[in-house]
Design a protein with these regions (language model features):
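Conserved NTP-donor binding/palm subdomain of two-metal-ion nucleotidyltransferases/polymerases, i.e.
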Residues: 1-118, 124-361
Length: 361
């Protein structure tokens, strides 16, 4: 991509910005369009154009492709929020044992049509995973995955291995038959990492959970600072794990957009509290990682957050370039230091060099 194409991509993704450089629209190429869809930012991009009154100022095919995705998101979210309410009813007397994550809350916070979700993620205390799972099973959910548009049940081995090695269960799925959502998928997480070893932290977050109320929706979710830290931890887990790099799913922009949204809405005092909470939980480096990468990929109007993150990692410059392979316990380092160049690379795996084992990291 050309420099101008990259700038247009960045501007279209930065939906919280109050200004937009119209000169960038001449770079509205199929290349930019492809990157928007690849990074699941197509609806957000249309929302940005609409916000600035520029939907009619860009190539028609470019705009119409984004508009279709935007309108589809609005339709899908109607069904998604129906599913959030339905799940809340199933778990109505389990309030102190879980919190809904990511899309269940964020889809209501984003501008309309700019974000949707394919599933509902739950954070559950490890000792309550079986109870929550039983509630879902009693409501008609089955464990498995969607393959080629159809449900495929998980084997007992897959169910056990997921709980033992991934810190999450095999998804619980039910066919709900809504116009824009045929299946409802619920993912139960009981760890912030692939290894189910941070149970104390998970329990503390759930004990501090809050209920966010909207006009037509109540969502039990994590407290704002813990919600931010969970997003950062989830992003870090995927961005620094070799299989995700190999699949080119390690730096998908929509994940950074969530952090961009929360940081854009936070003033300095609120940002300081986020980092203070991260230090309490021992996740300050992970949060710094997410903030630094987000500040490079979006036009983030929170200079304090970026500066604070840089300060946290100043003595560990390799932290933001480290990738691990859980299978063979190897450690890798990105040879390309520029985050934006890594993001737009066609194959990030070739930018890695082996750097010892995890035990020696």
């Amino acid at each position: 991509m050309t420099k101008k194409e990259k700038e247009l991509f960045k501007s279209l993704c930065s939906f919280k910005e109050n200004t937009f450089d119209k000169k960038l629209l001449s770079a509205a190429t199929p290349n930019v369009l492809g990157h928007l869809f690849f990074n699941r930012m197509q609806a957000t991009a249309y929302g940005t154009l609409k916000k600035h009154g520029l939907a009619g100022a860009v190539n028609r095919e470019f705009a119409n492709s984004l508009k279709a995705a935007y309108e589809r998101n609005i339709e899908k979210n109607r069904d998604f929020f129906t599913c959030v309410r339905y799940l809340g009813e199933i778990l109505s007397d389990c309030g102190d044992k879980y919190a809904m994550l990511k899309g269940a809350y964020l889809c209501r916070v984003y501008p309309e049509g700019c974000r949707t979700s394919n599933d509902i993620d739950l954070l559950v205390k490890p000792e309550d995973v079986t109870e929550i799972g039983n509630r879902l099973s009693s409501a008609g959910f089955k464990q498995g995955n969607i393959r080629n548009g159809e449900f495929k049940a998980a084997s007992r081995r897959e169910i056990i291995e997921s709980k033992m090695t991934r810190g999450e269960t095999v998804p619980y799925i039910k066919e709900v038959g809504l116009p824009a959502m045929r299946f409802l998928e619920v993912d139960i997480n009981f760890s912030l990492d692939y290894k189910p070893g941070d149970t104390g932290l998970v329990c503390e977050m759930i004990n501090n959970a809050v209920t966010e109320e909207f006009d037509d929706l109540r969502v039990r979710t994590l407290r704002r600072d813990d919600f931010f830290i969970h997003l950062c931890s989830h992003l870090y887990k995927e961005a620094t794990t070799l299989p995700w790099v190999e699949m080119m799913r390690d730096m998908t922009a929509y994940k950074y957009a969530d952090i961009y949204l929360l940081l854009s809405d936070a003033d300095r005092e609120q940002t300081e509290r986020l980092f203070e909470r991260a230090r309490e939980l021992g996740t300050e480096k992970i949060c710094a990682f997410a903030v630094i990468e987000t500040s490079r990929l979006f036009k983030l109007d929170n200079s304090y957050a970026a500066a604070a993150a840089e300060e946290i990692l100043k003595d560990d410059p390799e932290f933001i370039r480290t990738v691990i392979s859980p299978n063979d316990k190897k450690k890798y380092i990105f040879t390309e230091k520029d985050i934006v160049k890594r993001f737009f690379a066609k194959n990030r795996k070739v930018l890695l060099k082996e750097a010892g084992s995890i035990e020696n990291a």
